[in-house]
UniProtKB/Swiss-Prot annotation:
It comes from Serratia marcescens. The gene is dam. It is an enzyme of class 2 (transferase). InterPro entries: Ade_MeTrfase_dom_2, DNA_methylase_N6_adenine_CS, M_m6A_EcoRV, MeTrfase_D12, SAM-dependent_MTases_sf. NCBIfam families: dam, PRK10904.1. The keyword DNA-binding applies. PROSITE patterns: N6_MTASE (PS00092). GO terms for molecular function: S-adenosyl-L-methionine binding; sequence-specific DNA binding; site-specific DNA-methyltransferase (adenine-specific) activity. Belongs to the N(4)/N(6)-methyltransferase family. It holds the Pfam family MethyltransfD12. This is DNA adenine methylase.
Amino acid sequence: MKKNRAFLKWAGGKYPLVDEIRRHLPAGDCLIEPFVGAGSVFLNTDYDAYILADINSDLINLYNIVKLRTDDFVRDARTLFADEFNNSDQFYLLREEFNTSTEPYRRALLFLYLNRHCYNGLCRYNLRGEFNVPFGRYKKPYFPEEELYWFAEKSRNATFVCEHYRDTMAKAAAGAVVYCDPPYAPLSATANFTAYHTNSFSIADQQSLAHLAHQLSVESRVPVLISNHDTELTRDWYQHAALYVVKARRTISRNILGRSKVNELLALYR
């Protein structure tokens, strides 16, 4: 199966792990993703239906607009990728517009622009909920037209919702399969990157997610696959699951020389 890339750049995106994740995802009628992120697993699987959720309202707004107004969105977004908008002055003007706009369609256009023009494609907000990633200084940011159209085509069988992971997992019924890609447990005290939205993801949340996954698999017979870093802590959280270790390359790092392979853990409850 050809691998399809997401149209967004995303911290911890699962494109490099798609083959391994597909190998361990059980068959079912509907795939539920409480942490959809850039959607690489959704884009590279073939379930009859999808329920795709995230706590980031900007992300879900963008996905619904790409699904419902594909041609308009591609046409209008392309104009923001002209050379005249690829400089720091324009970037910060458009970032300010994004942070003050309440118009969903315009916010969706600007969210894609910011994602492709900001530093490392990071998605980060301050405590006021304002997007605050600096300008990335890329020579020619890529406009993901082909990826947008593929996403829209796949979205015909998908429902996008902005909600807490517990509410999404509560939708799981017979025939469903759940894939969870929560904000990763930190490898070290300085490696924590969970503030991609104003709602941070705590150790208690990680433990609660593991408990909920175990509960779903036992009480509702719904299989749940979770991905995370392979650490003593995550192995303890997922002690009731079958564990599979995968090598992957973490691509978001402040120190380029520090970009090395770390073990990833796939925990399957079934």
